[in-house]
Amino acid sequence: MQTIHIGVLSASDRASKGVYEDLSGKAIQEVLSEYLLNPLEFHYEIVADERDLIEKSLIKMCDEYQCDLVVTTGGTGPALRDITPEATKKVCQKMLPGFGELMRMTSLKYVPTAILSRQSAGIRNKSLIINLPGKPKSIRECLEAVFPAIPYCVDLILGNYMQVNEKNIQAFRPKQ
């Protein structure tokens, strides 16, 4: 079974300064560990809400670490310093708006302010980048919604084959 390389990028001014512990990045790692059977190698970084820092981290995770999947958390709201979607768009060759649409629809079941979220997803080379919200509960809800499409998307961009733990979640792959 191939090792899946996963980038986890937390964008947070306060967590990057050690003001509080980054629980969101850990939540992403926990959920993906439940969903995938492959050996996983996580490449984890916390950066301030600075566009150039986010862009550099995304590029490093995609180009240097050759991550199959890069998941960001934080910086997707309407606040002035929330710029993760802009950084993602800048480094991607293609955007995948359906991921953000589904995450907003899912989150609206729980909170009306989900309409303010700007989650997005895109492709850089052979890496799928997905922007998630910043709260662990919301991360789990959004990943549960979009994960069924992730393994097939990674197949299509020629990433490593993701073996799904079907006891915990289902994924969709068209019949060969």
Curated annotation (Swiss-Prot):
It catalyses: molybdopterin + ATP + H(+) = adenylyl-molybdopterin + diphosphate. The keyword Transcription does not apply. Keywords: ATP-binding, Molybdenum cofactor biosynthesis, Nucleotide-binding, Transferase. Pfam families: MoCF_biosynth. GO terms for molecular function: ATP binding; molybdopterin adenylyltransferase activity. It is an enzyme of class 2 (transferase). Its EC number is 2.7.7.75. The keyword DNA-binding does not apply. It comes from the Bacteria. SMART domains: MoCF_biosynth. Pathway: Cofactor biosynthesis; molybdopterin biosynthesis. GO terms for biological process: Mo-molybdopterin cofactor biosynthetic process. Catalyzes the adenylation of molybdopterin as part of the biosynthesis of the molybdenum-cofactor. Belongs to the MoaB/Mog family. This is Molybdopterin adenylyltransferase. The gene is mog.
